[in-house]
């Protein structure tokens, strides 16, 4: 086998449609566009979501809710994620160094999901009641 002899398998590639090249091609004259109308014209067509003048769905439905800007700087951390952090003292900088949270995160909260297998000291993070109990039962402590 040589690079200059490689070719696609037989029947794997289809010839492109050549529209407007005579009636024998099956796509002559109107080229598969039908007669007249906006979609038959060059550059013709309607925008996405256009329903022919009827009030479109995206305008019939009400607006609701918003995205809190706090959510971009806040993270939830599972107890199982603490396994990725080196050292016994875990704070926001340690979480960032271990790539558990992104660099833009300013606040983090530990939640009870998974389990912690070693005694760790949590410093400067928010902790749920369940996570607090799990950390303390593993011999760890929480410093505010």
UniProtKB/Swiss-Prot annotation:
Residues 1-53 are annotated as: Disordered. Pfam families: Ribosomal_L27A (PF00828). PROSITE patterns: RIBOSOMAL_L15. InterPro entries: Ribosomal_uL15, Ribosomal_uL15/eL18, Ribosomal_uL15/eL18_sf, Ribosomal_uL15_bac-type, Ribosomal_uL15_CS. Residues 21-31 have a biased composition (Gly residues). One of its GO terms (molecular function) is rRNA binding. GO terms for cellular component: cytosolic large ribosomal subunit. Keywords: Ribonucleoprotein, Ribosomal protein, RNA-binding, rRNA-binding. GO terms for biological process: translation. The keyword RNA-binding applies. Belongs to the universal ribosomal protein uL15 family. Binds to the 23S rRNA. HAMAP family: Ribosomal_uL15. Part of the 50S ribosomal subunit. This is Large ribosomal subunit protein uL15.
